[in-house]
Amino acid sequence: MWYTTVRNPSIALIKQGYHILAEYNLVKEELKNIYAIPSYACGLHWFGVIFVHSGIYAGSVFRFSILLPDNFPADISLPTVVFSSAVLHPHICPQNKTLDLAHFLNEWRKDEHHIWHVLRYIQSIFADAEGSICTGQSSSGDLVVMDEVRNMDALNILVKSRPEYIERVQEQAILSRNLIYDRPPTEDPHYIIVEPYCAERHLKFMDQLKSPCWKEATSMDCSQPSEYLGHIDSSRQMDEEETNQLEKLHRGRIPEPQREEAEVSL
């Protein structure tokens, strides 16, 4: 017997669930420094967080939600990206904190587009804010800026007073790092929780991930790991330090241990 999704809405929900699971698997494989997962309560509502390591937004940590259309992925309507806190950016509305995806996609095509494309776009607007507002070059070689964006004030400041824009963004970055530790606004078990580094709690997980040769190569004089890591105050600095330690491993001809993929604690 042939079943149609029109007569069997439960089958449509099952198929939609498989699509969402496939999207989540792609997100895990394709991207770094940005995390997103469907909520436990509803697969059409995703929780996300991005750690920005480069550009004028470096050091920022932003939470956001992705809201998918009811008929995802068949619906041509674009997902809605809403940031949890105010973010100064030309493409983010200062009133409702939504990201404008219209400059990136005209419509959603289920055979071509995936949620990781949206996440990649989020990364790109923070990595290169100025590039995200340019449409090309004039005959004289000057950059042509978009006429309309969600936040025209942010656009004008970025174009006419870049130092002021950077100053405001860096103030915002400090605030974002403080807000990331706020209590979850929901009891959904899939909400992404970020915790400050705590030696007593986290060193045991480091012990599981790093072999004795790693510890020997990365020891800093007589300092305890917690004392040394206490001087690292940003995710970017942590990445830079890890790169330095990897170089030490190679210079000392110590084989690099196989590292398990660390997943965000949910």
Curated annotation (Swiss-Prot):
Q: What phylogenetic lineage does the species belong to? A: Eukaryota, Metazoa, Ecdysozoa, Arthropoda, Hexapoda
Q: What name does this protein carry?
A: Protein crossbronx-like
Spell out the family assignment given in the record's similarity comment.
Belongs to the ubiquitin-conjugating enzyme family. FTS subfamily.
Which species does this protein come from?
Drosophila sechellia
Disordered, as annotated region: 226-266
Identify the Gene3D superfamilies for this entry.
Ubiquitin Conjugating Enzyme
What residues does the UBC core domain cover? Answer: 15-178
Compositionally biased, Basic and acidic residues: which spans? 245-266
What the entry lists under SMART domains is as follows: UBCc
Q: Which InterPro entries match?
A: UBQ-conjugat_E2_core (IPR000608), UBQ-conjugating_enzyme/RWD (IPR016135)
